Amino acid sequence: LFLAYIFYPTLIRIFTKRKIAEYIKAIFPIQLLAFSTSSSSATLPFTMEHSQKSLGISEETASFVLPLGATVNMDGTSCYQAIVVIFIAQIFGIDLTTTQYFTILFLTVLASIGTAGVPGASVVMTVMVMSSVGIPVEGLALILGIDRPLDMLRTVVNVTGDTFVATIIDKRAS
């Protein structure tokens, strides 16, 4: 949530001179829909329409950047996967090497790009990352019970990142 409510709005303020509260208020309906559906893909039509109306993003930018972002810009998912893998390693008492940390970083970025924008899809990719660095996948059972609310929050971060990128690109293009 740091990304959605502090980092992105601060960069919006720096690059577009838009007030932080104004930006958060404008994207809140998008975030609310993302939270309730847990799907970047399901929110895409509303995200495109609402970002044009409330953020003033041009139709050209919205129709190119937002679908691309809904597919590959899964920053909430990437952060989640890295945190889960490291958390489970700590639970099992596994000391990770620097190489393993960089492997986790690299794989979570790649896995987040390949994660479908549907609820629960990141669990499969997290298993892949865990097995590639030698962490027992059984540990994921500790997270699965609370994955749904976490998925809802990840989706909020993902769509906020999409609107952030679209806003910056639209500002730079005009």
Residue ranges, per PLM feature:
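Transmembrane alpha-helical segments and their short flanking loops
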Residues: 82-174
